[in-house]
Amino acid sequence: MIELLLKEGYIDILNIDIKPPRENKHSQYWRQCDILDLGALKKEIQAFNPELVVHLAAKTGLTRARLDCYAENMVGVRNMFEALKLAPAVQRAIFTSSLLVCQMGYIPKHDTDYKPSTFYGESKMIGEKIVREQKDLNFSWTIIRPISIWGPWGEEPYINLFRSIKQGWYFHIGGGHYRRSLGYVENAVFSIYKLLRAPLEKVSGKTFYIADYEPADLYDMANEIGAQLKARRIFHLPLMPIKVLAAIGDFLRGRGWENVPLQSFRLKNILTEYVFDMSPLKEVVGPQPFTLKEGIARTIKWLKLNQQL
């Protein structure tokens, strides 16, 4: 996000995070702050007095055993509102939620049609409700729900996908071509920026999914990655033995192994198709800058430059 803002000519940028930026040249814009520390957050926001805000901070992961493990997604959102109310220059704020406010495979009928199946998803649902309950604000808000963002600077699971294809041990599960809405990271950042700059009446109080406009066929995507990496052909594994391995993973997780590589929940996510209507985003944002093939090429280039492939 900072890289795009710099290219667009912005110089007054503040990045609040508990961790330093992974890109060293962005360190000058970083202030260490925990969004759960309301006093510190108010101090930073008041001092900077921003006009445009993108709230990305979150506690992620699906394995935590209690809702309160995701306080950043609930208390953190409320704290951000309390801090922004003290900054008179604020005009707009974008709050980042998740597609997991609904279980995988469920396409909601409207913005508040919630159906979470994990504590993480529930925490994001609560975060959205905190946004929607705000009254008498001097700035507008927008909610975004990113969908499976991948690309440079990414981590699991998509970076591991590139590595496994390169090393020749990736197998496609089952015989089907699973179609999914996915978001290449530079397209996602571009879309968020465009939402910040869009006419107010098109974005105020609205919810947008963030992804590429066209869904990806996961098998075709894997083949394209393999072709660009000059890797071996990708083969299919029958579904039944994979289900057995997932059941073993369930057993191991029940015995205390939290990060089991494969379990039934993860297998279901792999096999579930979800394609979202991206026309509301496209109507506001317009054409996105990169195709799927270009995104793959740019990701491979970044991985090689950073010695991660």
Language model features: what each stretch is:
Residues 35-72, 86, 104-108:
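NAD(P)H-binding glycine-rich loop region in Rossmannoid oxidoreductase-like domains
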Residues 102-103, 139-160:
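Flexible, glycine-rich beta-alpha linker
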Residues 117-145:
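Active-site Tyr-X1-5-Lys
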Residues 185, 223, 245-288:
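Conserved C-terminal active-site "lid" loop/helix of NAD(P)H-dependent oxidoreductases
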